[in-house]
């Protein structure tokens, strides 16, 4: 029986939206209550009886720490892990990618079952992690929580066999017949270590490539689809507009 930990990457600069605050704190007003968008994925993780969550931030994200604090107000313990900028040369700093953010808290995630979700997403039902975790049986190493999308060109689309075992991930395909995208992930320590090895020893820093390498190496992925589930992310102004329209419904 492994310990559980949540993992929420929130280290990106979020420059596309140009908000004067971290996009993870974009205000969602529901039933006359304010909740930042990142509160939703935290709730999803806590619903699955996970009481320790690692949030990956960059050195400018003080407001996230101010909002979430140590987690006690949100029924969990929160550890903040700072992902530092890589200096490629003296004049140009590049933000490390998502895969590197997923690996940054390795010292906290190794040896545990990881519940991973993005800080700028709203996913329904609220207990989807709890439901999906029931499929994490002894012969399955990774669970992909899957949702329908009308924009596969922005998503990681999932190829399945008849038993919902994942054959590969097609990342952001221009055209596809695939029905499901992955929106959040649960994984066992075997995948944490594989992921860490890809980043540090194999120089593979694209998460879709790492997923596919893992599948090829025999790590067993299973898809759990939420037929009536909802997945909304906040990558662009169009997404913000969709979120507003969805909340009105």
Q: What does each of the following model-derived ranges do?
A:
Residues 1-64, 78, 83:
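N-terminal glycine-rich phosphate-binding loop and ensuing alpha1 helix
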Residues 16, 63-66, 233, 242:
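Phosphate- and divalent-cation-binding pockets in alpha/beta enzyme and binding domains
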Residues 25, 158-160, 223:
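A structural signal for short hydrophobic beta-strand segments in well-ordered beta-sheet cores
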Residues 37-41, 97-104, 210:
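Well-ordered alpha-helical segments embedded in enzymatic catalytic cores
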Residues 42-43, 61-64, 69, 125-137, ...:
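Short alpha-helix within the catalytic core of nucleotide-sugar-dependent glycosyltransferases
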Residues 58, 81-83, 145, 169, ...:
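Conserved beta-strand termini and adjacent loop/short-helix elements that scaffold enzyme active sites
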Residues 73-162:
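Conserved beta-loop-beta/alpha segment of the NTase-like Rossmann-fold superfamily
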Residues 115, 133, 165-249:
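Catalytic-core segments of class I nucleotidyltransferases/pyrophosphorylases
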């Amino acid at each position: 029986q492994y310990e559980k930990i949540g993992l929420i990457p929130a280290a990106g600069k979020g420059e596309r939206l140009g908000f004067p605050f971290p996009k993870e704190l974009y205000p969602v007003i529901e039933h006359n209550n304010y909740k930042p968008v990142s509160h939703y994925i935290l709730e999803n993780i806590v619903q699955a009886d996970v009481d320790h969550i690692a949030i990956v931030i960059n050195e400018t994200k003080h407001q996230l720490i101010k909002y979430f604090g140590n987690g006690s107000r949100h029924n969990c313990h929160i550890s903040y892990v700072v992902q530092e900028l890589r200096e490629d040369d003296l004049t140009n700093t590049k933000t490390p990618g998502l895969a590197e953010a997923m690996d940054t808290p390795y010292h906290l995630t190794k040896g545990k079952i990881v519940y991973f979700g993005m800080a700028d997403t709203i996913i329904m039902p609220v207990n989807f992690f709890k439901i999906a975790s029931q499929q994490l049986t002894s012969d399955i190493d990774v669970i992909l929580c899957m949702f329908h999308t009308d924009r596969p060109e922005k998503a990681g689309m999932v190829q399945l066999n008849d038993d919902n075992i994942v054959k590969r991930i097609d990342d952001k395909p221009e055209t596809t017949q695939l029905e499901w995208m992955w929106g959040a992930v649960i994984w066992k320590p075997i995948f944490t270590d594989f992921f860490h090895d890809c980043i540090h020893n194999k120089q593979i820093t694209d998460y879709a490539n790492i997923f596919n390498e893992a599948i090829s190496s025999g790590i067993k992925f299973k898809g759990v689809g939420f037929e009536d589930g909802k997945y909304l992310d906040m990558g662009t102004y169009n997404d913000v507009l969709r979120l507003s329209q969805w909340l009105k419904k």
